[in-house]
């Protein structure tokens, strides 16, 4: 739900680095380009103005399921790591090394969310983004993996499946699906302070 959100991949990951950079910079421009070209043109797309808590073209769906606030958590299970989405990559000049060891992980910071502009497009895992599913994007948690996200203001929590990369804006630590943001009570504000706890890879 913010302008660092990325151009969705047109196909399975060409490389984690190129995909992350392309998605990070071109979403607000409405571009639909091959990933390599998108990365080259990234520098020209940084001036889109905000409208509310998200950038022009993104936001909540026109129709919200009546029971979305009661949607069930993602169910953690052990899955093989994606062969390409867990490689080191660079996005917006910063290098990231995804975590691949099965080790505890906790992090506090701001959560944002992404919505209708990306609904139906591919994530870094190659899966189709469903804005109503309990999923999330994280810069370094394994893809796929599961995490409990807790709203530090109201105590609500949700279990999400990490299947995408981002956010790449300072202070943001996780990009939630719209459904997960509704569950946590941060959809209206656009962001909220949360704690992320890894559950399993």
Regions found by a protein language model. Give the residues of each.
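Secreted/periplasmic proteins
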Residues: 45-201
């Amino acid at each position: 739900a913010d302008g660092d959100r990325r151009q969705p991949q047109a196909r399975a990951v060409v490389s984690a680095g190129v995909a992350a950079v392309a998605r990070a910079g071109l979403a607000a421009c409405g571009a639909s380009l091959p990933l390599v070209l998108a990365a080259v043109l990234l520098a020209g797309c940084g001036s889109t103005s905000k409208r509310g808590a998200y950038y022009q073209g993104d936001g909540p769906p026109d129709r919200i399921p009546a029971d979305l606030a009661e949607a069930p958590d993602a169910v953690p299970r052990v899955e093989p790591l994606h062969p390409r989405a867990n490689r080191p990559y660079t996005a917006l000049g910063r290098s990231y090394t995804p975590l691949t060891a099965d080790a505890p992980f906790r992090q506090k910071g701001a959560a944002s969310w992404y919505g209708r502009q990306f609904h139906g497009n591919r994530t870094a895992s190659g899966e189709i983004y469903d804005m109503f599913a309990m999923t999330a994007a994280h810069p370094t948690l394994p893809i796929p993996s599961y995490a409990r996200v807790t709203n530090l203001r109201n105590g609500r929590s949700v279990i999400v499946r990490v299947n995408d990369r981002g956010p790449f804006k300072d202070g943001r630590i996780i990009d939630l699906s719209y459904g997960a943001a509704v569950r946590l009570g941060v959809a209206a504000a656009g962001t909220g302070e949360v704690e992320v706890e890894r559950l399993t890879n």
